[in-house]
Each structure stands twice: as C-alpha cells, then as structure tokens.
Amino acid sequence: MTEFQDLTISNNFMFAAVMEDTENCRGLLEMVLEFPIARIEVSTEKSIIHHPQYHGVRLDVYAKGDDSARYNVEMQVRNKDNLPKRSRYYHSQIDMDIIAKGTDYKELPDTYVIFICDFDPFGFGKYKYTFDMICTETGEMLDDGARTIFLSTKGTNGSEVSEGLRKFLGYVAADIAASTEDFDDDYVRSLQKSVSRIKSDREMGERYMLLKELLSDERAEGINEGRTEGIAIGRVRGKAEFVIELLSELGEVSTEISDAIMAEKDPARLLAYLKAASKADSVEKFRKETGL
C-alpha cells in the first residue's frame, strides 16, 4: 500500500476521509448530478476511518439528503469488469437497509450510485455515463428512482460536461506531484486543502497505518474460517466479492472466472476460493488450484 504522505484523492481511504466533510461531499454530488442539494448527512457508522476495529468495513461514501435521497459514491482505480453488477448490488443494499427499518417499498427514496473511475469503464471516451431503467420497446423511463453514474478520468468529450467536472476528474487522475498544482478551480482547491489537513492529522495517519496492518495480516495469515465478510479497499460485499478483490491484486480477472465466483452459493466452496486466493501468487495459479 502507498505511504500515507503519498496518498492522493484517488486512494479510497483518502477519498472517504475528504468526503466526510459535508461541504466537500455536497459539492461533488451537485457537480455530478447537476441539481442543488440543500443539505446532506454523511454516514460514518461503518467507516474504518472512525472505527478501525471493524472488519468488513466500508471505504466508500454513503450520504443521505434532506429529501431522503440516498447517495453512494466509490472511487475505482482498477477496472475489475464487475461494476455494473456491483452497482445493482449497491442499489439493492440501500433499499433493503431502508425497508429493514420499517419503510414501505412504496416510500423508497431515490438512490444514486456513483463510481469515479480512473479508467474508461465502457470505452466510449465519455467523462460521464448515466444509466436509468428504460423500456426496450418504447424508450419510456421506468421512473423507479434508481440512477447509476460512472465518471471517467479518461474522457475526451469535454464540450459535453461542465468545466468543473473536467477539472475535478483531472485532479483525480493526477499523481502525487501533479495533485498539488493549481487546477484553477475553487472546488478542487477545497479538496486540496482537505487532503493537506488530513495528512497533517496524526490520528488519521495512525488509522491508515492500522488499515495497512489489517490488510497485511489478512494476506499473510489467510482467511479466518469464521469470517464471512472480509476487508478490502472499497466495500467488500461478502466472500465472493472478496475473492475477486484478492485476485484483482494479482492480475486481470476474466469475466468467466468472476461470474463463476459470483454464482457460487456454497459457503464451503467460497471459503475454499478465499483460501486459494489468499495464497496464490497469480490468477492462473488460483484457476488451476480451484478448477475454475
């Protein structure tokens, strides 16, 4: 893992820490969604930044708006080819969390899942890809209140998005040296100040070091049989996704392998995959070990 002082906003830990400032988070959401948001509440309940004792934690950003809308934002620096299914899962998790608290499904709020990608997830050269549910035959909107947005730092259609969004994505793509340059944008400047403040915070540095130790111990010791969630950068949604997270650190994971892992429902089999992934030094070795 990158040293604390060398982190940029594209790092999940740093991104989550910066976005815990409600003004930073609200500014991002308004820029991406292109409508005003009066007030938001950023959830830190399960964030390792505030609760480093947790395993199975989140390093994405979860926020609630004044109108009860829910927002989930995640930084992605590697193309794992599972983002569409991941977005579907995030929407369902938000809905289930709300329903579990007694809300009728008819009163479900609008949900927005946003991925900020340091790559082009679809290959069309867009800075922004927006997905809504529509009727295949008529093109009519379903209006189910769920929207998924993928941002890309590799966009080439500058005239189709705001200057602020382009500069923000340029900041996301910047390496440690370039990230301190002046992007001539007030919002980016506010993010740069937040990054500097976080890096000067000794407690935040200690929490990041603890995260490094947790991940290092997890890799070295393998997967404890009693653990069902695991930890990883970004939200890890159970054993199957943890296997894919581990494998992606070793190399490119084919759609065939990732689909087979996600389709596996046998807990014992998933545990075997986890153990194999934690010990493998390549995706090919994992494939041979598991027969996938």
Spans of model-derived segments:
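Elongated, amphipathic alpha-helical interaction scaffolds
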Residues: M1-L292
